[in-house]
Every structure is written in structure tokens, then in C-alpha cells.
């Protein structure tokens, strides 16, 4: 189904099939390549294809080496010789109710979008890490167990953020969680809730 701004994927894992229609100008060597982009959401598999063009499938939970260490989007470079009306078939599946929003933009524009989003994510990671270091320092200095619950809450929150952004699956130490799929996200959220309750209990 379409929500007005993208394609809504069924939450039971059934593949959604849809077709993208767009038009490209004549190739210009002075400009960067066109690319097909989707914002990064929890899809089990994302496939794009057109006559003579079939890139490797992509997955939120199993990022490839081409995605880099901190991927912020799904992207595929379009053939440089394409111009005029084009059609791409897309197949996507997810165990969660998610919306895919496709974009066809220049490579340079896509990189700028990713840089902005990555800067926000890294800032949030750094903030949580600073709070975790403060909690650990207080725990070691004051020997108060209440700081242990706060440290656990910060650690669980950082893990949840890494999983929600898909960055955990690109880290060798956490890549195994990709096998859990959407359930791994749910389990991580339960950890955040449990540690948050402990903090509320200790500081009440």
C-alpha cells in the first residue's frame, strides 16, 4: 500500500512488489552519477532490478561490505548511460510495519544527506558514551550500586540506538544479532525498559 509519501510494507514478512517510474536527463560528464536511494529501515531484503541491471540485494540486518561501517541509507548507483524514461522493479520484505521512501538523486547529493544524518547519529552515540563514562567513574569512586543501574541503562540505550540505526550489524562483535532479525530489536528494547525501571527504583 502507499501512504502518500512511500510504500508501506506488510508486517508479516510477505514481499511487497512495486514499480518506480522516473525520467533522467541526458548524461553529463561534469555531474556525478545518479543513484536510487531508500532511507534505512528494518527490511529483511531489498531487491531492485531493471532490464540489463540487477544489483546485489540489500538487507538492514546483513549489511554488505559496500555499505560501509555506519550506513545511513540503502543506495544503488544507476547505469551512467541511462537517460529518458526509466522503470525499476523493487521487491522488499519486513517483519515490521515500515515505509520505504525511494529517491533518485545525484551521488553528491546522496552523500550530503548521509553525512548530515551520520553527524546526528554520531553526536547521539557520543552523548550516551559520555554519560556511561561518568556513571562508571561515579561507580568506581563512590562505590554506590545505584550508579551501576544507571551505567546499565546507558549501555542498553547505546545498544538499542546502534541496532535501530542498523550500525550494530556492521560491527564484527555485534553482527551475530542480525540472525535475530526484528526480534533482536524487541529484545533490546526490553533491556532498555528493564534497566530504566532499575534506575527509577534506585533514584526514587
Residue locations for each model-derived region?
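Cytosolic-side membrane-insertion boundary helix
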Residues: 103-141, 145
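Charge-dense, low-complexity intrinsically disordered segments
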Residues: 10-12, 123, 187
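Soluble non-transmembrane domains of integral membrane proteins
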Residues: 1-118
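Generic hydrophobic/packing signal
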Residues: 83-85, 97, 122-126, 151, ...
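Juxtamembrane segments at transmembrane-helix boundaries
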Residues: 129-204
Amino acid at each position: 500500500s502507499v501512504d502518500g509519501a512511500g510504500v508501506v510494507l506488510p508486517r508479516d514478512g510477505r514481499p511487497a512488489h512495486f514499480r518506480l517510474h522516473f525520467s533522467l536527463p541526458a548524461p553529463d560528464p561534469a555531474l556525478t552519477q545518479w543513484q536510487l536511494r531508500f532511507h534505512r529501515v528494518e527490511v529483511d531484503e531489498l531487491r531492485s532490478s531493471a532490464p540489463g541491471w540487477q544489483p546485489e540485494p540489500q538487507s538492514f540486518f546483513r549489511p554488505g561490505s559496500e555499505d560501509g561501517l555506519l550506513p545511513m541509507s540503502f543506495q544503488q548507483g544507476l547505469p551512467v548511460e541511462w537517460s529518458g524514461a526509466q522503470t525499476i522493479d523493487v521487491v522488499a520484505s519486513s517483519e515490521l510495519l515500515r515505509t520505504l521512501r525511494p529517491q533518485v538523486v545525484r551521488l553528491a547529493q546522496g552523500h550530503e544527506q548521509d553525512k548530515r544524518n551520520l553527524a546526528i547519529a554520531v553526536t547521539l552515540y557520543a552523548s550516551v558514551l559520555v554519560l556511561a563514562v561518568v556513571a562508571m567513574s561515579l561507580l568506581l569512586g563512590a562505590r554506590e550500586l545505584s550508579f551501576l543501574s544507571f551505567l546499565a541503562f546507558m549501555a542498553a540505550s547505546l545498544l538499542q540506538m546502534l541496532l535501530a540505526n542498523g550500525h550494530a550489524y556492521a560491527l564484527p562483535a555485534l553482527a551475530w544479532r542480525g540472525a535475530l532479525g526484528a526480534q533482536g530489536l524487541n529484545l533490546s528494547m526490553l533491556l532498555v525498559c528493564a534497566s530504566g525501571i532499575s534506575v527509577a527504583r534506585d533514584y526514587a
